[in-house]
C-alpha cells in the first residue's frame, strides 16, 4: 500500500494536477512510474454498464453483459434497505469481476416533479426513505471493496437544460428536502465518492459550490472521500479543486492540467489545495485496486438473476383489486394482450442502460404457469401509432377468455436521461384498447410498466391494477407469480400519484428553458404538498394493497419512537410496511402536515401477530432555522402517526418534545401561502420573502456557458446555422417518436463542455475563440481558434512527454 503523504512529496506539481482529471471516458490517469494505477469507473445504479469498446456516457454503445436489477424507482416501493444492501453487494461483486473500481450510483435526486425524465433512476419524493435505501446500496457495493458514488449532488430535478440551469432554492428547503437524503447516505453508508451535479445552485455551479462541498458535505457531515464531476460537468476546474471537487471527468486532456498550473502560479489556488484533493483520491485508487486484484473474475449470474427476481417481487405494488379478482385461480382461461407482455420494458434509457445477462418474458412465464393461456395479441403499437387491426384482434381474443391480462406502459423513449416527459399520460392507443376490451370483457387485469407516475383516468375500465414499475431482467417471473398468487404483492408507493399533472405544485414552471429554476413550492413536494393542501390524489404516498389484511394495535410512543402490534387478519401470508409520520398542530413555523420519520417491514403468517418497534433518530423533530443558521427543534406537542400510507393512519399518540429554538426563523411572518401549503401559484413577493433576497434573473450571455440550444442568440451566421441544424435534427427525431439522445445532449450542452469532453482535442482557449466568433468578431475569433488549436497540440504533446518521463 502506497503512503499518500510520501507520494505527494515525490510527485511534481504538474503530475499532481494531471491526476485530478480523467484519462479516458471511464478511466482515471495512472502513473506506473510512481506506482499509481489507472482505475475504471462505470455507470451502475441498477446494473453495471462497463463499455469495453468505444465508450460514451449516454448508454448509446454496447456494454459488457451484467445483471439488470429493478430500477431505484421500483426497489423504493419495497421500502427495504436490507434488500438494497443485497443488490448493492451484487453490483459490487460484478464490478469487481469486471475490474471496475467505482460504481456511479445510486441516484439520490428528490422527485420534485413526476415529469423528470430520469425519475426511474431515483428512489423517492421523500428524503428519509431515499437516504435509507441509498445507504443500503452503498454499504452493499462497498462490502466488495468497490467504491460507491451516490449522485447527483445537489438540487438536480430536471433533464431540460441540466448542464446550465440554476436551481434557486431557499436554505431551509435545501437542507430539509434536497440534502437530507444525501446526509443520511453519507453518514450511514460512508461512500468513498460522491458525484456533483451539472447545475448551478443559487448562482454557483454545484461542482465548485463551497457551501455545498466544503461547508456542508465535508465540514458538517465529515465526508472525506472524492467528489467526482458528472461527465463534462466541470465549469471552473481550479475553483472546483479549491472548493472541494476532487476528480474532473471524463477526459479534458492537458488543458485541464495547464488550468490548474496557471491557477497555482496566479495564487487563485495553492498547491496544498491540490494535495488535499489527492489525499482524497489516491487512497480510493489504491484501496479499490488492491481489492479488485484479489477479487474473482467471475460472478454467479444465476444467483444474481434470482436476487433480481426477488427484488422485483418485493417491489410490485397492487393498486386495485376489485372483487378480489387477483390472484387468478388455477386453470383460469386468460387472454394475454399488450406488446409489453412479449417485448418487456424493464429498464430506462440513457447512461444506466444495462446489457442484461438474460431477460425473462411475461408471456412465456404465464404459459409455463398453472393458468390456461388461450392466446396472445399485441393489441397496440407501443410507440403510440393507432392500429385498428391490432385492436380488433385483441378484442376478439378477449371475448373468449375468463380474464384479460393487459400489459400497458410507457415506451422506451418516454423516460430517459437527457429529456423530460411532456405529460403523464399513457399513449392514447393503449387507453382506447383498454376501453374497447372493457366493453367485451370487464374482467381485466392491467399490468403497468413505467419508471414513474402516470395519470389513470382509465382506472374504472379495469378490475385490477398491478404496478410492475421497471422490474429489471427477472421482473416477468415476479409478475407471473403475483398474478397466480405464488407471490403476495406487498410493495407500497414511494411517490404520490396525482389525479392530474396540473395538481403537482411545480407543474406551472417545470422544465422550461429559462436559465433559472425557481423552487417556489419550498418544502411542499409530493405528499408534503398534497396532505397539507388537502388535495385529493389518485394513489397516496405509501399506498399499496395486498392479498391479505393487517390490523394495528397497542401503540406506545415517546420521543425515542413507537412500538405496536401488527396482526395478519387475512388468510394468506404477507408483508406489511408500517409507516411512522410526525405532525405538529398549531406550529409557529410553516411545515408539512405530515412527514415520514420511520418505517418497518413485518412478514406474518395468517393469524400471526408481532410486536414491532420503530425508532426515531436525530432528524425526527429538527428543522433548519434560517435565522440562527442551524438545526433546531420546535418544542411542544407532536402527534406520532402510524399507518399503512400517508392517508391511511391507523394509530396516533401525542407526545411532548423539548425545544431548542430561541429565535423565529422568519423576520417577516407574512408567508400565508406557505402556512396553508397553497403553493401552486406563489407570487414573486412571497418567494423573495422565503429566499430572503430578490429572485435572481437569469440572462442569456454569449460566453462559455451558452448552450448549443441557445446559439440563436449569437451574432454570427455560424452560430445560427449550428442552432438551426440541431433544432431540425431534434424535431425530426421527435416526429419519428425516437428523440436522439446524442443530439439532445449536444443541444443542452454549454460551449465549455467542448473542452471537457474531447480528450484534449479542444482547449478552453479555443472555446474562447468560438465565443468571439459568436459575439460577432468572426475574423478575430477564427484566427484565435486556429492559433489556439496549433498551440494546444504542441502543449499537449510536450506535457505527455514530460509525464511519461521521456
Specify the residue positions occupied by each region the protein language model found.
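Glycoside hydrolase catalytic-domain context in secreted enzymes
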Residues: 1-619, 623, 637-641, 646, ...
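Terminal connector regions
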Residues: 618-665
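A generic signature of intrinsically disordered, low-complexity regions enriched in glycine/proline
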Residues: 47, 368, 507, 572, ...
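Long, low-hydrophobicity ectodomains and other hydrophilic envelope-associated domains
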Residues: 689-806
Amino acid at each position: 500500500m502506497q503512503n499518500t503523504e510520501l507520494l505527494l512529496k515525490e510527485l511534481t506539481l504538474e503530475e499532481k494536477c494531471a491526476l485530478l482529471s480523467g484519462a479516458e471516458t471511464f478511466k482515471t490517469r495512472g502513473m506506473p512510474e510512481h506506482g499509481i494505477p489507472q482505475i475504471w469507473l462505470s455507470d451502475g445504479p441498477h446494473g453495471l454498464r462497463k463499455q469495453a469498446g468505444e465508450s460514451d456516457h449516454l448508454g448509446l454503445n454496447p456494454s459488457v453483459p451484467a445483471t439488470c436489477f429493478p430500477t431505484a424507482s421500483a426497489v423504493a416501493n419495497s421500502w427495504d434497505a436490507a434488500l438494497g444492501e443485497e443488490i448493492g453487494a451484487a453490483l459490487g461483486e460484478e464490478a469487481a469481476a469486471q475490474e471496475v473500481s467505482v460504481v456511479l450510483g445510486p441516484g439520490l435526486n428528490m422527485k420534485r416533479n413526476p415529469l423528470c425524465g430520469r425519475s426511474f433512476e431515483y428512489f423517492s419524493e421523500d428524503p428519509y426513505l431515499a437516504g435509507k435505501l441509498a445507504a443500503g446500496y452503498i454499504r452493499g457495493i462497498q462490502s466488495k471493496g468497490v467504491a460507491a458514488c451516490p449522485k447527483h449532488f445537489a438540487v438536480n430535478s430536471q433533464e431540460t437544460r441540466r448542464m446550465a440551469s440554476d436551481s434557486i432554492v431557499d436554505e431551509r428547503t435545501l437542507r430539509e428536502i434536497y440534502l437530507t437524503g444525501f446526509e443520511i447516505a453519507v453518514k450511514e453508508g460512508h461512500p468513498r465518492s460522491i458525484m456533483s451535479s451539472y447545475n448551478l445552485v443559487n448562482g454557483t455551479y454545484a461542482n465548485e459550490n463551497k457551501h455545498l462541498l466544503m461547508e456542508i458535505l465535508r465540514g458538517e457531515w465529515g465526508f472525506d472521500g472524492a467528489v467526482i464531476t458528472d461527465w463534462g460537468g466541470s465549469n471552473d476546474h481550479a475553483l472546483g479543486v479549491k472548493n472541494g471537487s476532487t476528480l474532473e471527468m471524463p477526459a479534458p486532456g492537458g488543458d485541464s492540467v495547464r488550468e490548474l498550473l496557471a491557477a497555482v502560479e496566479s495564487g487563485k489556488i495553492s498547491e496544498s489545495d491540490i494535495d488535499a484533493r489527492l489525499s482524497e483520491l489516491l487512497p480510493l485508487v489504491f484501496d479499490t485496486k488492491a481489492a479488485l486484484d484479489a477479487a474473482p473474475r467471475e460472478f454467479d449470474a444465476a444467483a444474481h438473476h434470482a436476487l433480481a427476481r426477488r427484488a422485483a417481487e418485493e417491489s410490485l405494488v397492487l393498486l386495485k383489486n376489485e372483487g378480489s379478482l387477483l390472484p387468478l385461480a388455477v386453470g383460469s382461461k386468460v387472454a394475454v394482450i399488450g406488446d409489453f407482455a412479449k417485448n418487456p420494458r424493464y429498464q430506462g434509457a440513457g447512461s444506466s442502460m444495462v446489457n442484461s445477462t438474460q431477460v425473462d418474458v411475461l408471456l412465456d412465464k404465464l404459459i409455463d404457469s398453472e393458468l390456461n393461456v388461450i392466446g396472445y395479441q399485441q393489441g397496440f403499437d407501443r410507440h403510440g401509432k393507432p392500429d385498428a387491426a391490432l385492436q380488433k384482434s385483441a378484442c376478439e381474443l378477449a371475448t373468449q377468455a375468463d380474464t384479460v391480462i393487459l400489459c400497458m406502459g410507457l415506451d422506451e423513449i418516454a423516460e430517459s436521461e437527457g429529456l423530460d416527459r411532456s405529460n403523464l399520460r399513457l399513449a392514447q392507443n393503449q387507453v382506447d384498447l383498454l376501453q374497447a376490451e372493457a366493453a367485451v370483457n370487464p374482467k381485466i387485469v392491467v399490468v403497468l410498466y413505467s419508471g414513474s407516475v402516470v395519470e389513470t383516468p382509465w382506472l374504472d375500465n379495469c378490475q385490477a391494477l398491478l404496478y410492475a414499475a421497471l422490474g429489471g431482467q427477472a421482473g416477468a417471473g415476479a409478475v407471473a407469480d403475483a398474478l397466480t398468487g405464488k407471490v403476495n404483492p406487498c410493495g407500497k408507493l414511494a411517490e404520490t400519484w396525482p389525479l392530474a399533472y396540473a395538481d403537482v405544485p411545480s407543474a406551472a414552471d417545470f422544465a422550461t428553458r429559462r436559465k433559472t429554476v425557481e423552487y417556489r413550492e419550498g418544502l411542499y413536494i409530493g405528499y408534503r404538498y398534497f396532505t397539507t393542501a388537502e388535495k385529493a390524489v389518485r394513489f397516496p404516498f405509501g399506498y399499496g394493497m395486498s392479498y391479505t389484511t393487517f390490523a394495528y394495535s397497542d401503540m406506545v410512543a415517546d420521543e425515542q419512537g413507537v412500538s405496536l402490534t401488527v396482526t395478519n387478519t387475512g388468510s394468506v401470508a404477507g408483508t406489511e410496511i408500517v409507516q411512522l409520520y410526525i405532525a405538529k398542530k398549531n406550529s409557529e413555523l410553516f411545515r408539512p402536515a405530515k412527514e415520514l420519520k420511520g418505517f418497518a417491514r413485518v412478514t406474518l403468517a395468517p393469524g400471526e401477530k408481532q410486536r414491532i418497534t420503530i425508532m426515531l433518530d436525530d432528524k425526527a423533530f429538527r428543522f433548519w432555522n434560517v435565522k440562527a443558521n442551524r438545526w433546531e427543534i420546535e418544542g411542544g406537542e407532536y402527534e406520532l402517526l402510524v399507518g399503512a400510507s400517508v392517508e391511511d393512519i391507523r394509530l396516533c399518540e401525542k407526545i411532548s418534545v423539548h425545544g431548542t429554538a430561541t429565535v423565529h426563523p422568519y423576520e417577516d411572518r407574512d408567508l400565508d401561502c406557505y402556512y396553508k401549503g397553497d403553493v401552486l401559484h406563489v407570487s414573486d413577493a412571497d418567494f423573495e420573502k422565503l429566499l430572503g433576497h430578490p429572485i435572481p434573473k437569469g440572462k442569456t450571455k454569449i460566453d462559455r456557458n451558452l448552450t448549443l440550444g441557445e446559439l440563436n442568440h449569437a451574432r454570427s451566421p455560424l452560430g445560427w446555422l449550428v442552432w438551426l441544424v440541431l433544432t431540425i435534427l431534434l424535431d425530426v427525431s421527435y416526429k419519428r417518436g425516437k428523440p436522439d439522445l446524442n443530439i439532445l445532449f449536444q443541444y443542452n450542452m454549454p460551449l465549455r463542455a467542448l473542452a471537457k469532453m474531447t480528450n484534449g482535442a479542444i482547449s478552453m482557449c479555443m472555446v474562447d475563440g468560438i465565443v468571439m466568433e459568436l459575439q460577432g468578431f468572426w475574423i478575430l475569433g477564427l484566427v484565435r481558434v486556429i492559433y489556439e488549436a496549433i498551440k494546444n497540440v504542441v502543449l499537449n504533446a510536450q506535457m505527455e512527454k514530460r509525464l511519461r518521463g521521456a
